[in-house]
Amino acid sequence: PMNSSAASDVYKRQSLDMAVNYAKERYAFGRPIGSYQAIKHKLADMYIALTLAKSNCYYAAWALSTDSADLPSASATARVSAIKAYQLCSQENIQTHGGNGFTWEYDCHMFYRRSKLLSLNLGSLSNWREKLVTSLEQSNIN
């Protein structure tokens, strides 16, 4: 789970970078679209989700390397946050690009489809949420 969580970090970052670059280059009403509050908030949300997912992945890696009792919940948390962050980043990347987001001239659609594929790679989001709940219940019982 952590390998795919870490691998998706690269794709999340590429989605964010693509959206930021497009927001700087694309002009509407004489200003870059990145200067508008709605776009700024989308980019900020993408960055926050990416950073939280990376932090959770680091925590899961630490739990694995130290044989921590938190490993089941840490790895499930890393996977859930990675899936959600990648889906958010790929969706908001498309939204930032507007109508161009689903054209073949831009790679936004590729990141969106890859986010769907990676989310099913080792189990669905609901599956990993259930694993997280189970591991948290077990840790509270002990």
Residue ranges and their predicted role:
Residues 62, 86-112:
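A glycine-biased, small/acidic residue-tolerant capping/turn segment at secondary-structure junctions
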Residues 38-41, 45-48, 52, 77-84, ...:
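DHp/HisKA dimerization-phosphoacceptor four-helix bundle of two-component histidine kinases
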